A protein has these predicted regions:
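Cleavable N-terminal export/targeting peptides
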Residues: 1-25
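Residues on the lipid-exposed face of transmembrane beta-strands in outer-membrane beta-barrel proteins
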Residues: 30, 34, 62-71, 105-109, ...
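Outer-membrane beta-barrel channels and translocator barrels
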Residues: 21-23, 72-76, 112-114, 162-164, ...
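Short N-terminal segments immediately surrounding and downstream of signal-peptide cleavage
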Residues: 20-36
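Surface-exposed coil loops of outer-membrane beta-barrel proteins
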Residues: 35-59, 88-104, 112-193, 199-203
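Outer-membrane beta-barrel pore domains
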Residues: 50-55, 88-98, 196-199, 207-333
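Glycine- and aromatic-enriched membrane insertion/assembly motifs of diderm outer-membrane
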Residues: 55-86
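Short beta-strand segments enriched in hydrophobic/aromatic residues
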Residues: 34, 71-73, 82-84, 111, ...
Length: 333
């Protein structure tokens, strides 16, 4: 009887240990966000927006909700990031395999402690900002982010050349072709990381709605314990036309719970397809207040264009500027 009891106890111990191991390997995370937005220089029923990705509604609106399922084995793993809501539909162009619900879905293999292969769809390596608002300081998005890729479908290899230097090489479908490519064309991506600064290159043919060539620098510096300066700059060319821009992200932490930051961005168009070579100065001031897993972000944004009048003021007259106040709430789990 004692032997039987010991055997059962041993099996139960193994089961509990295996269960604990599985719980550590499998994780669920995600976020939910919503916002309120009102224009300061125009009527809320004017039907206009800044012209950047996401958060383009007035009044109360849903951003997105996403759930990330991750399984990490000893050397292999998989990630599925499911998303819904207007921000999710915009990020996947609502033309996904399952009607815009798959943000990311990929498998990976840690070939060694210095080499990782990733196969599937993954969010872009270009730019300072990302799709999920929980990972951005500003709630609204920049022009640089809005005009670059959101995601890539393909194969990439990440190499840790040292503790502070990395290299990524990628072969993908053309710009934001998230599921099936009907053109038979491919894009190439390269990222060189150097002490927290990243030089990114992307190129496709530019035809069939492709992006063409883009070079991007993304980085930042901790100037003091409480002051961080983020930097993003990019140049795009597609058959002689494209965009350019630069953005600074100074952010100051005033306490453990509150930070304030500015995004100052200059963005412009160039080339034969843009004869007026319009440009915009976009200033966004954002506060960030943290309550446990909830982030509350009040934000004021002003965009002012040169050689373009894309907005309508409160009198219904075309104008070159638009300002808005936004209050967003983001919960992460």
């Amino acid at each position: 009887m004692k032997k039987l009891f010991k055997a059962v106890a041993f099996l139960l111990t193994i089961g509990v240990f295996a269960q604990e191991t599985e719980e550590k390997a499998f994780t669920i995370s995600g976020s939910v966000d919503a916002y309120f937005q009102t224009y300061l220089t125009a009527s809320d029923d004017s039907g206009q927006a800044f012209g950047t990705a996401f958060a383009d509604q007035t009044g109360f609106a849903l951003g997105m909700a996403n759930v990330i399922f991750s399984y990490e084995g000893e050397s292999v793993g998989a990630v599925v990031d499911l998303v819904t809501g207007p921000r999710g539909a915009g990020a996947t162009f609502n033309t996904d395999i399952v009607d815009g619900i798959v943000n990311q879905a990929y498998v990976y293999w840690n070939v060694s402690d210095k080499t990782t292969l990733t196969f599937g769809r993954w969010n872009t390596f270009l730019g300072y900002e990302v799709i999920a608002p929980a990972s951005n300081f500003n709630y609204s998005c920049s022009y640089l982010f809005s005009n670059g890729p959101f995601s890539h479908m393909g194969l990439k290899a990440d190499f840790a050349l040292s503790d502070d230097i990395s290299l990524m090489l990628a072969v993908t479908h053309p710009w934001d072709t998230n599921d099936i490519s009907a053109t038979g064309e491919y894009g190439l991506g390269v990222q060189l990381g150097f002490y927290g600064q990243y030089l990114n290159l992307y190129n496709d043919s530019g035809s069939n709605g492709g992006l063409g060539f883009e070079i991007d620098y993304t980085g930042g510096f901790d100037l003091t314990d409480s002051f961080f300066l983020g930097i993003n700059a990019a140049y795009n060319d597609n058959d002689g036309s494209g965009f350019y821009g630069a953005a600074l992200y100074p952010q100051i932490s005033t306490s453990d719970d509150f930070s304030i930051g500015l995004r100052g961005e200059l963005f412009g168009l160039h080339g034969d397809a843009n004869p007026n070579e319009e440009s915009v100065l976009a200033l966004t001031l954002t506060g960030s207040y943290v309550v446990e897993d909830l982030i509350i972000k009040p934000e004021i944004r002003l965009d002012s264009w040169t050689d373009a009048t894309p907005y309508i003021d409160s009198d219904g007259v075309a104008t070159d500027n638009l300002a808005a106040f936004t209050l967003a709430a983001i919960y992460s789990f």
